[in-house]
């Protein structure tokens, strides 16, 4: 089961379940404050001296089956080459979790995303399914990460996809760009993804 959620809901959930064994994977320097175990491909052990830190050196996560009550994967999945295997590993090591991803709009707007991200992410609200496709750069980016973070304060639902899952992560991966590549204007992406607060300016 996977469905939409919010960061606020997740923070409250974890705060109310402080006995949970929580893993944060691929968080860089911004681990969830409730995580007990941190893992990343970088050696960040000095930064997380008050946590258990494990450096990742292989695709397979170094944890037992269902070792964790909850796993956080925030802005990680879009970087992973073998995304099917990564999702299987999340399901294997934890009972449930939170996934945070950039929307297709944010992915195209941000300079750093152009070379670092491999996948576009959407969510099918009818079938409750994560829809993954090869990234296509529809237009040249115009924003920095720092600028986008400021926009997130107002337009978070338009720029960030927030999902909670339990038992399994229903998803589909389309690795071909042939069916997905269409010239999409900045205006059309804004209309599709931006919240109603901003849409009035683009009618």
Residues of each region from the PLM?
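Long, low-complexity intrinsically disordered regions enriched in Ser/Thr, Asp/Glu, Pro/Gly
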Residues: 1-18, 185, 191-202
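S-adenosyl-L-methionine-dependent methyltransferase catalytic module, highlighting the catalytic core
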Residues: 84-203
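Conserved SAM-binding loop
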Residues: 7-109
